[in-house]
Amino acid sequence: MRKIIHIDMDCFYAAVEMRDNPALREVPLAIGGSADRRGVISTCNYVARRFGVRSAMPSALARKLCPPLVLIPGRMAVYKEVSRLLRAIFLRYTEQVEPLSLDEAYLDVTMSPCCGGSATLMAREIRAAINTELGLTASAGVAPNKFLAKLASEQRKPDGLFVIRPQEVDEFVRQLPLGKLPGIGRKTADRLESLGLYSCEDARQLGNEELIARFGKLGEMLAGRIWGHDEQPVQAQRVRKTIGVETTLASDVLDEAACWQVLRQLIPELEQRFSVSHGKEQLMGQGIKLKFADFQQTTVYRRGGYQPERFHDLLHEGLLRAQGKPIRLLGLVVGLPAAGEVNQLALDLA
């Protein structure tokens, strides 16, 4: 049986700012782009959350909800350095560390001799070290696999620890709403609910074969998760799959020509980024990202050799999906080869 710890820092960027400037601790604080330049909130402290401010919210809306909000652009170099120190703490307990972002990681401590092999005690020590050495707090979840460990870390936020022991997995998962499972978004949850499936117990009653027959690949994932199964390993070396660039527009646009003009200006930056590590002939595909004025988004991606002019065709398809909704953000992405994968330029899988 594996022992997995999920560590999630509490409102990380804002917490670093409050640590370094105590005057910010009791005021509503957010890190993000300027409201005057259509910025978006990256994170906020719990004081701001009481006003309804949330991550990914337009800064202008955050200002309306919370007029006294202190909005700062953030200090990415500082956050990266704190993240480096955070990782150093993790490595005292195991080499099997999979960072998900600057402030979140999985640790596989199955074979760790620390704390007599107790994952719970290791999680407690890690949280104490983060508080003592970095002046920050973290929430932790301990469970037999990754998806349960992540769910566990959400149970006692902020600054808490929750453990799901092997013998507790079935009961914990049984009552979970399906919408809480990783990979289940609002639309998928609505689809499941239309069939009378609200909880993992409901899905169990339907049966694995029926889930797979109705939902295909999604059903295969559900068939494992509703029983608490997840065999995904903690990946100490995560392979980057894509490289992209994006920009938020000064004002929403509808016109395809205007969108294409923006994308053409992004292409040189994209090519500069991927050329550091990959040649054009190595790329496995390309795509565009559109975010609409209502903050819904879509990505149009096609496998095959890199052709800059193809972005125009992808843009056209993306705008058809938009169904007249104004565009607030545009982005480009290219797919990188997996280890040992050969790009067959003549084969266009689009």
Curated annotation (Swiss-Prot):
Quaternary structure annotation from Swiss-Prot or TrEMBL: Monomer.
Function, in words: Poorly processive, error-prone DNA polymerase involved in untargeted mutagenesis. Copies undamaged DNA at stalled replication forks, which arise in vivo from mismatched or misaligned primer ends. These misaligned primers can be extended by PolIV. Exhibits no 3'-5' exonuclease (proofreading) activity. May be involved in translesional synthesis, in conjunction with the beta clamp from PolIII.
Domain UmuC: 4-185
Catalytic activity annotation: DNA(n) + a 2'-deoxyribonucleoside 5'-triphosphate = DNA(n+1) + diphosphate
Record-given protein name: DNA polymerase IV
Primary enzyme class: transferase
Residues the record marks as active site: 104
Entry keyword Acyltransferase: no
Lineage of the organism: Bacteria, Pseudomonadati, Pseudomonadota, Gammaproteobacteria, Aeromonadales
Domain of life: Bacteria
Cofactor, how bound (note): Binds 2 magnesium ions per subunit.
GO biological process: DNA-templated DNA replication; error-prone translesion synthesis; SOS response
Family note: Belongs to the DNA polymerase type-Y family.
Marked site: Substrate discrimination: 13
One term under GO cellular component: cytosol
InterPro entries given in the database record: DNA/RNA_pol_sf, DNA_pol_Y-fam_lit_finger_sf, DNA_pol_Y-fam_little_finger, DNA_polymerase-Y, DNApol_IV, PolY_HhH_motif, Rev_trsase/Diguanyl_cyclase, UmuC
Cofactor(s) needed for function: Mg(2+)
Keyword annotations of the record: Cytoplasm, DNA damage, DNA repair, DNA replication, DNA-binding, DNA-directed DNA polymerase, Magnesium, Metal-binding, Mutator protein, Nucleotidyltransferase, Transferase
Subcellular location: Cytoplasm
Residues bound to Mg(2+): 8, 103
Keyword flag Transferase: yes
Disulfide bridges in this chain: none
Matching SUPFAM superfamilies: DNA/RNA polymerases, Lesion bypass DNA polymerase (Y-family), little finger domain
Source organism (scientific name): Aeromonas hydrophila subsp. hydrophila (strain ATCC 7966 / DSM 30187 / BCRC 13018 / CCUG 14551 / JCM 1027 / KCTC 2358 / NCIMB 9240 / NCTC 8049)
